[in-house]
C-alpha cells in the first residue's frame, strides 16, 4: 500500500499542468472577460484607500471610465480601455468581477456551496497596453476566493512609478510585500501577463508564478488567509494614481481566467 501511494504521489508530481487541469472535474476556462459584463468600478481615496461611496466616475477628486469594444489598440479585435484621472494624489480605481457566487457575471451562483470549496488552482491571463505607462503608480491584478470562513486574496501589484517591482499581498497583516522581482512593462506595446496561484490542502495561499512577456519567475510564497463570511470567487483589476494623479489609460485584451 505504501509503495502504491508513493507511486501515485510521484505520478501526480510528474504530470504536466495542462493534464492536471483538463482531467479535473472542476476545470473551467472563461475567455475574453474584458468584453463581458459584470465589471464594477470603485474609487479608493488616499490615504486610507477605503471605498469612496460618494465618488462618481465623472467627479473631480478622482474620475474613471471603462470602455469596451475598442478595435485599436487590440489583440483580439475588441479590447477594453480603462482610464483613471482626478486631482487627489495616489488615489486608485478598482474594477471587480464576481465569477462564482452571489452576483456572478457567469451565472455560476453555487448556492449549494459544492463548487468553490473544491477549487484549488487559478490562472489570470491578460494582455495590457499603455501609451504612457510611466504615469501609472502601479497596476494590480488580484484573484480572490472566499470559502469555509476564510478569505484568500492573491494580490499582485506591478509598481511602475512606485519602483518597477512586483509586490504580493499579505492577507493577515493587510500590507504589500516586495518580491525583489522587477516589473518593467513595455510602453506603446502589448504586454502579456500570466499569474498562477493555488490554495493548498492546508488552506494556505500559494503564490506560484508570475510571467511577464515570456519571463517567468517562480515565487513559491506561502501565506495564511484572513477570515470572512463570503462565499465566492472574484477577480480584480486596479489602476493606481501617482503623486499628481496624472490621467492615464490601460487597454486590456484576451483576459482569460481559469480555475480547477
Show which residues each predicted segment covers.
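Sec/Tat signal peptide C-region and signal peptidase I cleavage site
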Residues: 15-20
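Extracellular beta-strand elements of beta-rich domains used
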Residues: 193, 250-257
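Flexible glycan-contacting loops in extracellular carbohydrate-active proteins
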Residues: 219-253
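Short tryptophan-centered beta-strand motifs in secreted/extracellular beta-sheet-rich domains
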Residues: 126, 189-199, 208-210
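Extracellular glycan-recognition surfaces and repeat-rich motifs
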Residues: 40-90
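Positively charged n-region of N-terminal signal peptides that target proteins for export
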Residues: 1-4
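Short, aromatic/His-centered strand-loop micro-motif at the edge of beta-sheets
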Residues: 168-194
Amino acid at each position: 500500500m505504501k509503495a502504491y501511494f508513493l507511486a501515485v504521489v510521484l505520478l501526480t508530481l510528474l504530470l504536466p499542468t495542462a493534464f492536471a487541469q483538463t482531467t479535473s472535474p472542476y476545470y473551467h476556462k472563461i475567455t475574453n472577460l474584458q468584453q463581458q459584463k459584470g465589471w464594477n468600478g470603485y474609487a479608493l481615496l488616499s490615504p486610507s484607500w477605503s471605498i469612496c461611496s460618494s465618488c462618481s466616475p465623472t467627479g473631480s477628486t478622482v474620475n474613471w471610465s471603462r470602455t469596451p469594444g475598442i478595435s485599436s489598440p487590440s489583440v483580439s479585435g475588441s479590447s477594453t480601455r480603462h482610464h483613471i484621472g482626478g486631482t487627489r494624489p495616489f488615489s486608485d480605481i478598482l474594477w471587480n468581477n464576481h465569477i462564482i457566487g452571489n452576483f456572478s457575471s457567469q451565472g455560476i451562483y453555487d448556492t449549494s456551496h459544492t463548487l468553490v470549496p473544491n477549487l484549488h488552482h487559478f490562472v489570470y491571463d491578460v494582455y495590457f497596453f499603455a501609451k504612457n505607462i510611466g504615469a501609472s503608480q502601479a497596476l494590480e491584478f488580484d484573484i480572490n476566493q472566499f470559502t469555509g470562513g476564510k478569505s484568500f486574496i492573491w494580490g499582485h501589484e506591478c509598481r511602475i512609478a512606485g519602483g518597477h517591482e512586483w509586490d504580493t499581498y499579505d492577507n493577515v497583516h493587510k500590507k504589500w510585500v516586495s518580491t525583489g522581482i522587477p516589473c518593467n512593462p513595455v510602453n506603446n506595446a502589448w504586454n502579456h501577463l500570466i499569474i498562477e496561484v493555488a490554495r493548498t490542502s492546508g488552506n494556505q495561499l500559494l503564490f506560484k508564478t508570475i510571467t511577464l512577456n515570456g519571463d517567468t519567475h517562480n515565487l513559491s510564497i506561502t501565506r495564511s488567509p484572513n477570515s470572512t463570511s463570503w462565499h465566492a470567487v472574484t477577480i480584480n483589476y486596479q489602476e493606481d494614481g501617482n503623486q499628481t494623479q496624472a490621467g492615464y489609460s490601460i487597454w486590456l485584451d484576451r483576459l482569460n481566467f481559469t480555475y480547477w
